UniProtKB/Swiss-Prot annotation:
Catalytic activity: tRNA(Leu) + L-leucine + ATP = L-leucyl-tRNA(Leu) + AMP + diphosphate
GO cellular component, one term: cytosol
Enzyme Commission number(s): 6.1.1.4
Keywords: Aminoacyl-tRNA synthetase, ATP-binding, Cytoplasm, Ligase, Nucleotide-binding, Protein biosynthesis
UniProt protein name: Leucine--tRNA ligase
Biological processes, Gene Ontology terms: leucyl-tRNA aminoacylation
Keyword hit for Protein transport: no
Lineage, top ranks: Bacteria, Bacillati, Bacillota, Bacilli, Lactobacillales
Transmembrane regions: none
Pfam families: Anticodon_1, tRNA-synt_1, tRNA-synt_1_2, tRNA-synt_1g
Highest rank taxon of the organism: Bacteria
GO molecular function: aminoacyl-tRNA deacylase activity; ATP binding; leucine-tRNA ligase activity
Family: Belongs to the class-I aminoacyl-tRNA synthetase family.
UniProt short sequence motif 'KMSKS' region, positions renumbered to this chain: 576-580
Encoding gene (name): leuS
C-alpha cells in the first residue's frame, strides 16, 4: 500500500499558504536564524533538478530551527535583470518585462510544488522599481564618496551582443554567453573602486566560516603582492616608465623590459624602422581578451620597439619590447625581465637572442633558468646576500637614489560597472552641457527604466536607451541648463550585491532596511549556493556590505557568516545537465510521478551535499519505497493509525529512538543529510521488528522526518491525532542515559577456552557473575565431574573458571 502523494501534497501546500505558516516571527526575545539561498535568475527554462538541492538543504535547517524555537528568516526572490531576457526579447520581439514576469510565475509555482517553507510576504524582484530604487541609492552614495567614477578603459566589446562584458565573462577569447568574438576597444565606462577595499576584503575572510577553497579563490583574485616600483628612463629621450616587481633584488639581472602594446608611450618611443612591426602587433593584440593574453600555457610573443631603457642600478641600456602578455590595466603596464631566473623570460630571451645574466648562484643558465634560492652574484652591493636581505637593501638603495620605492600591488582591478544594454537598472546620473555630472536627486529615485518597443543595441557602443530622446534629454527646471541622462545600465551583479538586506525589511519605503532589524538579523547564518559564484558575486556583495558599514547603514563587517556550496547534480551519464545534451530532468515530471517528498529525500540521500553526483532513476524509486514503508508502518489499510501504536513502552525501541533523535539532530545541523536519512531508515527497520510501537516514539520519528519530507510528515502527524501543523511543535529531545547500553555481553571461559556468552545487566558484582556462569548450560557441561580450583571474574567482561 502506498500513499497518494498528489492529494496529500496539494492539501498541505494549500494549508500552509492559507495559514501563513512560514511568515517570519520577529520576536526580539528569541534567537534568530537567517537561512538564505542564492536567489535564482528566472530563466525561460524554469527550474531544473539542480535548484532544489540547495533549496532543500536550507529548508530542512529552517524547519528544524523553527521547531527548536528560533525566529527563522527563510526568504526567496528573483535576480531578474540580465542578458538572457534581453536576448530573448531581441530574438522574439517580446517585452523583457513580460517575459520575466511569466518566468517568475513558473519558478514560483515550481518552488511551491516542492513544499519549501519560504516567507512569500518578503518576496523581492530586482527589476521592481521599489527594489532598484535602493540599488540606485547605493550607487549615488558610492558616487558621493568618490568610489564610482568614469574612465576611458579598454573593454571587452562583443559586436554581436552590442555590449561590453567583464573580464570574468570572457572564456578563451569568446563571450561566455553565446560564444561570440570579443574585441578590445577603449570606451567611456563607469567603474566602482573595489580596490579601495582590497586589504579589508582579504583580512576579513578570517571572520567568516567559509570553505577554505573559496577563501583561497578570493585571496588569489585580490592577489596582493609586496614588491617595489622601479623607474626606468628611455635612452635618448625625456620619457620614463615604471615597473612593479616582487623581486627588486634581481635588478642587476634585468636584460630587457616589456611594455603593454596599448600604452601611449609605445608610439612615442618606437623607432621608424620598427613602426610597421609594432603597429601590426598592436592590431593583433586588440583582438584578444585579457584572459587569453595572460594564459600561462601559451608561448610569450613580442616585438622590439627599437628603443632602449636605462637600468637604474648599473646604467646599462637594455632593449624595450612590447608583448601581449603584459596588460596596461595590470600593475603599471610594464615589466622588467630577468631571464636567468624566470622560465618564460628565459624562453623569450633564447628565442630573440637577448642577453641572459645570472644574479643568483646555484643553477646552470646555459641549459635552463634557475628559479631556486641562493646567494646573490654579479650584483655589486648585493653580492653574497640572501633573498630577504637583498630585497631590503635594494629597496633602501632605490629610495635613496629616487628611482623607486617599496610598494604593494594587487591583481584586483576596479569593477567595470556599466553595460550597454536596456534590461538593467538605469544609472542615476545626468551629464550637463557645461561638462559637469550630477546624480539624480534622492527624491526622484527610482529613476525608472522607460518602456520601449525598440531595445536593439544602438551599435555605437551606447545602450538602446540612447535611442529614447524624450527620456535621455532633460532640462534643469531652476537654471534651464540642458543635460543628458546616462544611457548605460548596471550589470546583473548590482541587484544581487545587497538583496539579503532587503529581505530583512522588504516593504520599507524610507530606507534600505530598519537599522534595528538589521542588527537583529545580520549576519546571514547560512548561505547556500553553487561554487560558480565563489569569486564575483561574493566579492561584490562583500564590497558593498563594507561600504554600507562605513556609511552606517549596516551593523556588521561581513554579510554571510557561514557559506556552503552544494555539489552539482549531473545527468545519468555523469555529464553536466544541459538542454543541448538533452539530459535535463524537469522537477515537474518527478513531482508528478513520485511526489515532492520523494524528490527532496532523494536529493538529500544521493551523497554528501557538497559532492557532484549523477542523477539516477533507481535512486528515486528507492526513496519513494522508503516513504511507502514509513506510511505502512504507521497507517493501516483504512487510512487510520495502526493498532500496534500504543501508549505501552516495552523498552525495545528506547535506545534506537534516542540514538535517532541525537544523530538526526546533529547531522542536520552539520548539513550531513544523507547520514541523517540513513539513521531514520535504521529506526524504521527496528520498528518493523517489534509488536508494540510506543506512540511518543512514532510522533518523534515523524517530527524528525518532516523537515525532509514535509507533506507526508504533516499528514502522518494528523493521522496520529494532532490537529495543528507540526511547524512549531517543539523538536524532539533525547535522553543521554537511554543511549548507554543497560546490558553487556559477558564471555564465559573454562580453562581459558570460550565456552559460552550471555547478555547480563551492566554493573553486576563478581559474585553475581560467578553464579550466572556456574548455572550456564554450556559451562556446566565442561566442569561436570571436575573440581573448580579458581574463578576469575572481570565485571562487564568475562568469567574464567579453572577446573580439573
Amino acid at each position: 500500500m502506498s500513499y497518494n502523494h498528489k492529494e496529500i501534497e496539494k492539501k498541505w501546500q494549500k494549508y500552509w499558504a492559507k495559514n501563513n505558516c512560514f511568515n517570519t516571527l520577529d520576536d526580539p526575545n528569541k534567537e534568530k536564524f537567517y537561512a538564505l539561498d542564492m536567489f535564482p535568475y528566472p530563466s525561460g527554462q524554469g527550474l531544473h533538478v539542480g535548484h532544489p538541492e540547495g533549496y532543500t538543504a536550507t529548508d530542512i535547517l529552517s524547519r528544524m530551527k523553527r521547531a527548536q524555537g528560533y525566529n527563522v528568516l527563510h526568504p526567496m526572490g528573483w535576480d531578474a535583470f540580465g542578458l538572457p531576457a534581453e536576448q530573448y526579447a531581441l530574438d522574439t520581439g517580446n517585452d523583457p518585462a513580460e517575459f520575466t514576469k511569466k518566468n517568475i510565475e513558473t519558478f514560483r509555482r515550481q518552488i511551491n510544488s516542492l513544499g519549501f517553507s519560504y516567507d512569500w510576504n518578503r518576496e523581492i524582484n530586482t527589476t521592481d522599481p521599489e527594489y532598484y530604487k535602493w540599488t540606485q541609492w547605493i550607487f549615488t552614495k558610492l558616487y558621493e564618496k568618490g568610489l564610482a567614477y568614469e574612465a576611458e578603459v579598454a573593454v571587452n566589446w562583443v559586436p554581436e551582443l552590442g555590449t561590453v562584458i567583464s573580464n570574468e565573462e570572457v572564456i578563451d577569447g569568446k563571450s561566455e554567453r553565446g560564444g561570440y568574438d570579443v574585441v578590445r576597444r577603449p570606451m567611456r565606462q563607469w567603474m566602482l573602486k573595489i580596490t579601495a577595499y582590497a586589504d579589508r576584503l582579504l583580512e576579513d575572510l578570517e571572520l567568516v566560516d567559509w570553505p577554505e577553497s573559496i577563501k583561497d579563490m578570493q585571496r588569489n583574485w585580490i592577489g596582493r603582492s609586496e614588491g617595489a616600483n622601479v623607474t626606468f628612463k628611455v635612452a635618448g629621450t625625456e620619457e620614463s616608465f615604471t615597473v612593479f616587481t616582487t623581486r627588486p633584488d634581481t635588478l642587476f639581472g634585468a636584460t630587457y623590459t616589456v611594455l603593454a602594446p596599448e600604452l601611449e608611450l609605445v608610439k612615442k618611443i618606437t623607432t621608424p624602422e620598427q613602426t610597421a612591426a609594432v603597429e601590426a602587433y598592436i592590431e593583433e593584440t586588440s583582438k584578444k581578451s585579457d584572459l587569453n593574453r595572460t594564459d600561462l600555457a601559451k608561448e610569450k610573443t613580442g616585438v622590439f620597439t627599437g628603443a632602449y631603457a636605462i637600468n637604474p642600478v648599473n646604467g646599462q641600456e637594455i632593449p624595450i619590447w612590447i608583448g601581449d602578455y603584459v596588460l596596461a590595466s595590470y600593475g603599471t603596464g610594464a615589466i622588467m625581465a630577468v631571464p636567468a631566473h624566470d622560465e618564460r623570460d628565459y624562453e623569450f630571451a633564447k628565442t630573440f637572442g637577448i642577453d641572459i645574466l645570472p644574479v643568483i648562484a646555484g643553477g646552470d643558465i646555459t641549459t635552463e633558468a634557475y628559479t631556486g634560492d641562493g646567494p646573490h652574484i654579479n650584483s655589486d652591493f648585493l653580492n653574497g646576500l640572501n633573498k630577504a636581505e637583498a630585497i631590503a637593501k635594494m629597496n633602501e638603495w632605490l629610495e635613496e637614489n629616487h628611482v623607486g620605492k617599496k610598494e604593494v600591488s594587487y591583481r584586483l582591478r576596479d569593477w567595470l560597472f556599466s553595460r550597454q544594454r536596456y534590461w538593467g537598472e538605469p544609472i542615476p546620473v545626468i551629464h550637463w552641457e557645461d561638462g559637469t555630472t550630477t546624480t539624480v536627486p534622492e527624491s526622484e529615485l527610482p529613476l525608472r527604466l522607460p518602456v520601449t518597443s525598440d531595445i536593439r543595441p544602438s551599435g555605437t557602443g551606447e545602450s538602446p536607451l540612447a535611442n529614447i530622446d524624450e527620456w535621455v534629454n532633460v532640462v534643469d527646471p531652476e537654471t534651464g541648463m540642458k543635460g543628458k541622462r546616462e544611457t548605460n545600465t548596471m550589470p546583473q551583479w548590482a541587484g544581487s550585491s545587497w538583496y539579503y538586506l532587503r529581505f530583512i525589511d522588504p516593504h520599507n519605503k524610507n530606507e534600505i532596511a530598519d537599522f534595528e532589524k538589521l542588527k537583529r538579523w545580520l549576519p546571514v547564518d547560512i548561505y547556500i549556493g553553487g561554487a560558480e559564484h565563489a569569486v564575483l558575486h561574493l566579492l561584490y556583495a562583500r564590497f558593498w556590505h563594507k561600504f554600507l558599514y562605513d556609511i552606517g547603514v549596516v551593523p556588521t563587517k561581513e554579510p554571510f557568516q557561514k557559506l556552503y556550496n552544494q555539489g552539482m547534480i549531473l545527468g545519468e551519464n555523469n555529464e553536466k545537465m544541459s538542454k543541448s545534451r538533452g539530459n535535463v530532468v524537469n522537477p515537474d515530471d518527478v513531482v508528478a510521478k513520485y511526489g515532492a517528498d520523494t524528490l527532496r529525500l532523494y536529493e538529500m540521500f544521493m551523497g554528501p551535499l557538497d559532492a557532484s553526483i549523477a542523477w539516477n532513476e533507481n535512486g528515486l524509486e528507492g526513496s519513494r519505497k522508503f516513504l511507502d514503508r514509513v506510511w505502512r508502518l504507521i497507517v493501516d489499510e483504512e487510512g487510520k493509525m495502526r493498532d500496534r501504536i500504543t501508549t505501552i513502552n516495552d523498552g525495545r525501541l528506547t535506545k534506537v529512538y534516542h540514538q535517532t533523535v541525537k544523530k538526526v539532530t546533529e547531522d542536520m545541523a552539520n548539513l550531513h543529510f544523507n547520514t541523517a536519512i540513513s539513521q531514520l531508515m535504521v529506526f524504521v527497520n527496528e520498528a518493523n521488528k517489534v509488536d508494540a510501537l510506543p506512540y511518543e516514539y512514532v510522533e518523534g520519528f515523524v517530527q524528525l522526518l518532516a523537515p525532509i519530507a514535509p507533506h507526508i510528515g504533516e499528514e502522518l502527524w494528523q493521522i496520529l491525532g494532532n490537529e495543528e501543523s507540526l511547524t512549531y511543535v517543539p523538536w524532539p529531545t533525547y535522553d543521554e542515559t537511554a543511549l548507554v547500553e543497560d546490558e553487556v555481553e559477558v564471555v564465559f571461559q573454562v580453562n581459558g577456552k570460550l565456552r559460552g556468552k550471555q547478555n547480563v545487566a551492566r554493573g553486576l558484582s563478581k559474585e553475581e557473575l560467578e553464579q550466572i556462569a556456574m548455572n550456564h548450560e554450556a559451562v556446566k557441561e565442561f566442569i561436570e565431574g571436575k573440581t573448580v580450583r579458581k574463578v576469575i571474574a572481570v565485571p562487564d567482561k568475562l568469567v574464567n573458571i579453572v577446573a580439573n
